[in-house]
Regions:
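Intrinsically disordered, low-complexity, mixed-charge
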Residues: 1-173, 177, 184
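Glycine-rich phosphate-binding/hydrolytic loop that grips phosphoryl groups
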Residues: 507-529, 533-535, 574-583, 710, ...
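Conserved phosphate-binding/catalytic loops in two-lobed NTP-binding clefts
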Residues: 483, 498-510, 732-736, 743, ...
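Internal gly/pro-rich beta-alpha loop/helix module
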Residues: 60, 145, 160, 168, ...
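Short glycine-rich phosphate-binding loop at a beta-alpha junction
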Residues: 232, 474-486, 728-739
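A phosphate-binding glycine/aspartate-rich beta-alpha loop in the early core of alpha/beta enzymes
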Residues: 230, 238-303
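Conserved phosphate-binding catalytic cores of ATP/NTP-utilizing and phosphoryl-transfer enzymes
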Residues: 276-281, 334, 360-365, 391-392, ...
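A contiguous, well-structured pocket-lining segment that forms one wall/lid of small-molecule binding clefts
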Residues: 173, 180-182, 430-468, 580-730, ...
Length: 788
């Protein structure tokens, strides 16, 4: 019998695709079958209305799906008696793993409906929502290949699972109170070593070491938060540390315990109404906050600096923005609302549960070993997390998401490039904000966020995550790409894998990541601005102009170098860079530093001696450290307690000035007319920093000078790009690197370049910071293999 055979490629597993196909076929009297093949969904359809099926695939597919290609052909097959979903089978080809999906509106409604059988069930899900990547063992996506495989469905759940009219038809994690995982608390007043020993001896029996289960556990966690305590909560991709975001003492205590004096905490708010009460939210931001990913979104805090703000001042000290998200897992919704008569606050701190620099805790044992000293009670569950996954964090630029950390909800969605390349490559990524990327032909799969590799627990997490993703993607890389820094842990990891290793320059990888995201492979002028990267000349780079293709680059400019003295301390203490620049560019440097209160005379002399004797000193073109220096000069931040603190504070000062003065005209530019744009082919950034210092000592406004620094630096960048463009004929500029998280500098630079008729590539869903360089490394590896 004539049979229409359809293959659908894309995100079609874990999103209710097979049930959708089954319903369409039943409605249109189409007989046949649908199955997962691992890399695609295959449909065999017999009947007069197969056009209706094809139309539904093109126009009415499940909203969580992403269809990249549909291939249709006809074959002669035996007649089918009905339409069925058949057992998944593996086949070679492209693989698409669905990210975890936030709870849908229908499940949320059922969760709080007393008449529903899943009323207050902490693991409610359906074909449209729930865990995917974090519970997956291997493809195709079926229950037996997930951590839900150990939970046998009850008859009622199984009926829903097998009924085409049910929203839970073929929903792999489906469960209920009778057959699903359970929540429980761990009492931390007991000896931690004894509890860990109980876990090791009873890995499948949480009752051996838990104190309360079910509703009692949830109520205990809620009461602890109300009482000002800190609760570790196991979510979809790991544990969070939660406390009352309106309780200043609780927030300050969490800061003290985590040794995190200033870095902002993420806040989970009860509802969109709550967010709008505290923050300014536009339409695009609201759509993302309420969408299936539900990331942390950076929003302007209406109450920042207000003494009458209900929110704790210590949430984000000195920061006009808040990182805000909505509850995306049922257990988080139940923390806000439960049938126990307790009244919860509308906002909770919800920060990753990890020791500083380490990956997010995934198991009970992780939590007990690493964060038991940070928390008063652990609210856990017995659904195993296979792959840890932090919350994604995003800003907005030009009405689109501008990713800071790409993880839950987005990873491991692939970046598809147009060149038809072949091969499998593993890119290890950066030392900080590590993610890795696996390239399989023209699909590049960036991983979820791992952490900073200076912590060996992050190195272990990287190795484990790489192995799991290779299993999920069913690929064995033939090449490893890593950063060229000889002392990075990522270099060690790459060299330990027993595969050929290619090392590429850090800032070149940044530009390649921007090119890959934009699917642009002609030659570009790359402006790669960040904190640090190992240069070809063994100095520190970070303010680079590169002429780039996917197969190579040429350094064609940089900011003016300075001496960075003090090793790791110089990356946290901007006053050192400021003093160095002033010393080497002013006759009366010591006096200027004294007047600016940058450092003592003794410290000034010590830095000068270190530089002259080449002790722990290196030549640097780091634009990140330049921002730190100007922040110190203006008395905003002399040192940073977390990466980017000083430079971000400088941006906030500039934005505050622009907002308060409705700044339009660039009349401040005249104050800088006596400094060159470039010096010996490099941006005259040292002269700019010195001029900022001179004007500040003359009494010029701090905010104006902060804004002027951004504006003049932007003009310098654009002038350099224009010069390179005229010489080379290249009309496209790619802007990447962590400094371009600064949306003020990004906007000023992009506007100026566009006004000159220059095309500008920027990031959106791939971070401009080191969390994105693995994508660039993977792109280079693919072209390397295909051009050998």
């Amino acid at each position: 019998m004539n049979t229409c055979v359809i293959r659908v490629y894309g995100i079609v597993q874990g999103v209710g695709f097979r049930p959708f196909v089954s319903r369409v076929c039943l409605d249109n009297n189409i007989k046949g079958s649908v199955s997962n093949k691992g890399s695609y969904v295959e449909i065999h359809a017999q009947g007069d209305n197969t056009d209706a099926l094809f139309d539904a695939l093109n126009h009415h597919a499940p909203k969580r799906s992403v269809i990249l290609e549909i291939i249709k052909k006809y074959a002669d097959e035996e007649p089918y008696e009905d339409f069925s979903i058949i057992e998944s089978e593996k086949d070679e080809g492209e693989i698409f793993v669905s990210p975890d999906i936030a709870i849908c509106d229908e499940c949320k409604e059922e969760l709080f409906n007393p008449k529903d059988r899943r009323y207050l069930h902490p693991f409610i899900n359906c074909t449209n929502c729930g865990p995917r990547l974090t519970i997956l063992d291997s493809m195709p996506y079926d229950r037996v290949r997930t951590s839900m495989g150990e939970f046998e469905m009850c008859p009622v759940c199984e009926k829903e699972y097998t009924s085409p009219e049910s929203r839970r038809y073929d929903a792999q994690p489906v469960c209920c109170h009778d057959c699903g995982p359970e929540v429980y608390t761990i009492d931390l007043s007991k000896d931690i070593k004894e509890i860990i020993e109980l876990i090791k001896n009873n890995p499948k029996d949480f009752r051996a070491y838990s104190s309360e289960t079910g509703s009692a556990a949830i109520t205990s966690a809620r009461k602890a938060i109300i009482d000002g305590k800190i609760v570790a909560v196991k979510g979809i991709g790991g544990f969070h540390l939660a406390c009352d975001a309106t309780n200043e003492e609780a927030v300050k205590r969490l800061r003290m315990l985590k040794t995190r004096p200033m870095k902002p905490f993420a806040v989970m708010m009860r509802s969109m109404e709550t967010i709008e009460k505290y923050c300014i939210v536009n339409g695009e931001q609201k759509e993302l906050l309420e969408g299936p990913q539900k990331p942390i979104v950076l929003l302007e805090n209406k109450t920042a600096g207000r003494k009458d703000s209900p929110l704790a001042p210590s949430l984000a000290p000195g920061n006009p923005t808040l990182g805000v998200m909505l509850p995306y897992a049922p257990i988080q919704l139940l923390l806000f609302d439960y049938n126990d008569s307790l009244s919860m606050p509308d906002a909770l701190v919800m920060t990753s549960a990890n020791a500083s620099g380490a990956p997010i805790c995934r198991t009970d044992e992780d939590a007990l070993n690493e964060i038991s000293s940070f928390t008063d009670i652990i609210l856990s569950n017995n659904r195993k997390i296979r792959l840890r996954c932090d919350d994604s964090v995003t800003d907005f630029f030009e009405g689109k998401p501008y990713m800071i950390r790409r993880s839950r909800g987005f990873a491991p969605l692939p970046v598809m490039i147009s060149p038809k390349v072949k091969g499998s490559v593993l890119a290890i990524g950066g030392e900080l904000k590590n993610t890795f990327c696996i390239a399989k032909d023209s699909l590049l799969y960036p991983s979820a966020y791992i952490g900073d590799m200076e912590d060996l627990r992050s190195v272990d997490a990287l190795n484990a995550s790489v192995k799991r993703m290779e299993t999920l993607l069913e690929t064995e890389p033939s090449l490893v790409v890593c950063d060229m820094h000889p002392l990075y842990h990522t270099t060690e990891v790459a060299e330990s894998l027993g595969l050929p290793v290619v090392k590429i320059q850090h800032h070149y990888a940044h530009i390649l990541s921007c090119m890959a995201e934009n699917n642009y492979f002609d030659e570009v002028i790359g402006v790669s601005f960040d904190g640090t990267g190992y240069g070809d000349d063994a100095t520190i780079w970070g303010g680079e102009f590169l002429k780039c293709t996917p197969t190579g680059y040429e350094r064609v400019g940089s900011i003016e170098p300075f001496i960075q003295s003090g090793g790791d301390a110089s990356s946290k203490e901007g006053w050192r860079i400021a003093a160095s620049i002033i010393r080497d560019n002013c006759d009366n440097g010591e006096e200027i530093c004294r007047k600016l209160d940058l450092c003592s005379d003794t410290e000034y002399t010590m830095l000068a001696q270190m530089a002259s004797m080449n002790i722990n000193s290196v030549r640097s073109t780091s634009s990140g450290r330049l921002f730190d220096a100007v922040s110190a000069i203006l008395g905003i931040r002399k040192q940073s307690t977390f990466e980017g603190e000083a430079s971000t504070s400088l941006m906030f000062e500039a934005m505050k000035y622009a907002k308060e003065t409705h700044f339009e005209k660039r009349d401040h530019m005249s104050r800088f007319s006596d400094i060159s744009i470039t010096t010996e082919g490099m941006l005259a950034t040292n002269a700019l920093a010195v001029k900022i210092a001179e004007l500040f000592l003359q009494g010029e406004d701090r905010g104006m000078l902060a804004y002027a620094f951004h504006d003049v630096l932007s003009a310098m960048i654009v002038d350099k790009c224009s010069t390179i463009s005229k010489i080379t004929g290249i009309k496209t500029v790619a802007l990447s690197g962590g400094v371009f998280q600064n949306t003020l500098l990004l906007r000023l630079t992009k506007e100026r370049l566009n006004s000159l008729g220059i095309n500008v590539l920027t990031h959106s869903l791939i971070p401009p910071n080191d969390g994105g360089i693995a994508l660039g490394q993977a792109l280079y590896g693919l072209f390397y293999i295909n051009n050998k």
